[in-house]
Amino acid sequence: MNILELSEQEVVRRNSLEQLRNLGIDPYPAAEYTVNAYSAEIKRNFNGDENVAKRQVSIAGRIMSRRIMGKATFMELQDAEGRIQIYITRDDICPGEDKEFYNTVVKKCTDIGDFIGVKGYVFRTQMGEISVHVQEMTFLSKAIRPLPVVKEKDGEVFDGFTDPEQRYRQRYVDLVVNSHVKDIFLKRTMVFNSMRSFFNECGYIEVDTPVLQSIPGGAAARPFITHHNALDIPLYLRIANELYLKRLIVGGFDGVYEFSRNFRNEGMDRTHNPEFTAMEIYVAYKDYNWMMNFTEQMLERICMDVLGTTQMKVGGKLIDFKAPYKRVTMIEAIHEHTGIDISGMNEAELRQVCDKLGVEHNETMGKGKLIDEIFGEKCEKNYIQPTFITDYPKEMSPLTKEHRTNPELTERFELMVNGKELANAYSELNDPIDQRERFEEQLKLSEKGDDEAMYIDNDFIRALEYGMPPTSGMGIGMDRLVMLLTGQESIQEVLLFPQMKPEKVAPRDTKEKFAVCGVPEEWVPVLHKAGYLTVQSMREDKPGKVMQQLMDINKKYKLGLAGLNLETVSAWQEAPYE
């Protein structure tokens, strides 16, 4: 890499890297470094009794701050549990006559961001801070790019690494400098573990189903399409795993569940990412009433396991997952929030309702989609506390069993929390003839232009023809659940690496383009370093200013390039250029 492409800090760090190697120190050793203690545990178990032998520890981590005070140096080391101060004195770490390790390695070659391992004893400083007195130090990894230095004073943060786009692109930096971010993802793991434990205690089996599918079934969504070269067939990234899990119920499992990575080629916003994690569970011999009770119990248990309470604040709103939850039919919900009773309405009448309410719609939408748009626009946002919206119209639910008392409805519920859907569940349709008819209705919607209509899966129908017991299934958006339990209002905050637009790169002319103006090849990187990334930007400044900046860089970095004069720079700027 050209030295001019580096910042001053990066140049200094690379010089330190070279100096370490010249001293015979490997800045990236391969050998295992034994760790027997961690920062939080050391502080928690410290015994300050002077009569007790000082505890010997071996810890490792990243340097987050350092203060050099002549023959002594204080550093703050960050490990998996937190941070702890370490204290290094010249004579303790270099007990002999040779003090070069302290004077050169500790004082000059260590930087914030470096990984080191230290061995020593635990003590309390005169200021009362529990620390490690270092007797031995090992370099584990040299950081050649500086971390953002976040400062804090009296509870106020300065120079914070807070720009959302930068944080999401460089999550590895975000995790290092913003400690609360790591806490979010630790809680995410706790949520998954708690849910998995709850299911396992019930005797249900965790399974894996295909991510690449020949038919993208189980949800109304637009799929990502790819191609299998060996088989020469199109394949789709999974939009849902529902139909495969139901096949397993046909095969004799009483209860199966899966945490699945799903992919939907649709919009991105604060609650949607094209790649997301869902959990789906299917239990034989149950119905949607049982599943509502089960879902309440599960969520209450998870909240207690992760937070120790069922209450949490999200955007200033207090949400309580304590069971039981309110239950409202979809027809009742629409009537409550619009004053219109849509029960029994046909497609034309629903379009009139949309027009009256100002709900956007188009000719590709069937009856179910129109009802969904009305509910989404006028009702959904009002359900802040956990609420089951039940008994959806049949047209909205092609995989759901017909309601036992009303043939126009289905036995389906969605759990609404904080104005968004969190979970979706059915009494599953197990009549193969009815299922085929529902798929054929979806095909008609597809022919009208609805690109979210479901595909016909003939193999799934064949599985149903062998017989599937009465079953209830439930799917839950894990990312949204984690958002709620960690008080986040954007899905990007609970995804380690959310999908992002390509990073913007400033336009930069090549050496060949500068050569057209007579700029020698060796001066092009210098122009770039000075901020003249294009010929046009070079032409916009006065020749004297351009020349002075180039000569300053030439001198500062000891490039040894031949001197410039005003006439030469003026000639570059005035040369014809297309």
From Swiss-Prot:
Cofactor names: Mg(2+)
Keyword terms of this UniProt record: Aminoacyl-tRNA synthetase, ATP-binding, Cytoplasm, Ligase, Magnesium, Metal-binding, Nucleotide-binding, Protein biosynthesis
Annotated GO biological process: lysyl-tRNA aminoacylation
Location in the cell: Cytoplasm
MF annotations from Gene Ontology: ATP binding; lysine-tRNA ligase activity; magnesium ion binding; tRNA binding
GO cellular component terms, semicolon-separated: cytosol
Chief location bin: cytoplasm
Superkingdom as given in the UniProt entry: Bacteria
PROSITE patterns: AA_TRNA_LIGASE_II
Family classification: Belongs to the class-II aminoacyl-tRNA synthetase family.
One Pfam family hit: tRNA_anti-codon
Protein name: Lysine--tRNA ligase
Gene source species: Porphyromonas gingivalis (strain ATCC BAA-308 / W83)
Keyword presence, Aminoacyl-tRNA synthetase: yes
Binding site residues for Mg(2+) 1: E414, E421
Swiss-Prot/TrEMBL catalytic activity: tRNA(Lys) + L-lysine + ATP = L-lysyl-tRNA(Lys) + AMP + diphosphate
Primary enzyme class: ligase
Residues annotated to bind Mg(2+) 2: E421
Iron-sulfur found in the keyword field: no
